Design a protein with these regions (language model features):
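Short acidic/histidine-rich motifs immediately flanking catalytic phosphotransfer sites
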Residues: 79-86
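Short glycine-rich anion-binding loops that position phosphate/pyrophosphate groups of nucleotides
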Residues: 24-26, 91-94, 117-119
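Short, glycine-/small-residue-rich phosphate/pyrophosphate-handling segment
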Residues: 63, 121-175
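Short beta->alpha junction loops
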Residues: 60-70
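Short, acidic/small-residue loops that bind anionic groups at enzyme active sites
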Residues: 104-124
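Glycine- and acidic-residue-enriched helix-capping/strand-helix junction motifs
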Residues: 29-44
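Short amphipathic alpha-helices and their capping/turn segments at secondary-structure boundaries
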Residues: 2-19, 101-104
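Short Gly/Thr/Asp-enriched flexible loops that form oxyanion-binding sites at enzyme active sites
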Residues: 78, 96-107
């Protein structure tokens, strides 16, 4: 999977480190509905796509994936002191991942929630899941959300988070300290 070359004008040349976390069932990419998940053949292919896109943005991407909530919690605890923000696809933890959400919230770092599908779409919608909308336990504390755009949701989240990290006034710094 190749990414397209593009130019984004950033207000900083700082090389942010952004952690991308993929939760349970993301290891099954390539075996799931093409309508929802597109042509990504594997989780490794997705990771490479996001990492390459990060290089174009001038940021470092660190990928982590697990089918186990405890492993994800340990990763968040271990990485919080060295990363600048998180992108998470909670996947199988979307409705039950309170522990992961709390751990992310405790880091006080920006968090982008991503989904291949539009989890808020009604049943049968073009980018929705077959069963209709679901309520994410992450959405109400996420800094931002990108969903319904397959792997492009990750690229949009990476772009938005990078630009937000560059803009000190956006993520809470007093406006006079830019």
């Amino acid at each position: 999977m190749s990414t397209h070359n593009f130019t984004v004008t950033r207000s900083s040349n700082r090389k942010h480190l952004i952690a991308v976390i993929d939760g349970p069932n993301m290891s099954s990419l390539g075996k799931r509905s093409k309508k929802v998940y597109g042509n990504i053949q594997s989780l490794d292919e997705l990771k490479e796509c996001v990492r390459n896109f990060g290089e174009q943005l001038g940021v470092e991407v660190e990928n982590f994936s697990s089918n186990h909530m405890g492993d994800i919690l340990e990763y968040i605890h271990e990485s919080a002191h060295r990363v600048d923000g998180y992108i998470i696809n909670p996947a199988g933890l979307t409705t039950i991942g309170e522990g992961v959400r709390h751990a992310l919230e405790d880091t006080e770092l920006p968090v982008m929630e991503v989904h291949f599908s539009n989890i808020a779409a009604s049943a049968g919608a073009a980018r929705g899941l077959g069963g209709g909308s679901i309520q994410s336990s992450f959405t109400h504390t996420a800094t931002g959300i990108c969903m319904g755009m397959r792997h492009y949701s990750y690229l949009a989240a990476l772009t938005a988070l990078t630009l937000a990290l560059d803009d000190q006034s956006f993520l809470g710094a007093p406006s006079g300290q830019q």
